[in-house]
């Protein structure tokens, strides 16, 4: 089974990648300290995937951009990875706004992501 095209709330068995991302504190041009993760997300159970620019096959939360050299890049995240969990929270049932707020909460993100180019899981 694949994580892509998964219906929210249904059990899923797929290969996933564990990622540990340590956020980075940077000082912006105005002297303000900001916390940097280096990725953007799209999707969520409240979003219509047919209207998204990348046409993802379901309403999951996806990485839509990874900045080169950022904490996300160093941790190994890739554009189009599907976020399954962050710090134990199920992202397959999360709205977009809640996902953004959840990602902002912790300095370290322990993530499980699915990647489209991984081989399928054999149940035998």
UniProtKB/Swiss-Prot annotation:
What are the TM regions of this chain, as residue ranges?
Answer: none
Give all residue intervals belonging to the PDZ domain. 18-106
Tell me the PROSITE patterns matching this sequence.
PDZ
Q: Which Pfam families match?
A: PDZ (PF00595)
Q: What is this protein called?
A: Tax1-binding protein 3 homolog
**Species:** Caenorhabditis elegans
What function is annotated for this protein?
May regulate a number of protein-protein interactions by competing for PDZ domain binding sites.
Q: Which InterPro entries match?
A: PDZ, PDZ_sf, Synaptic_Scaffolding_LAP-MAGUK, Tax1-binding_p3
SMART domains membership: PDZ
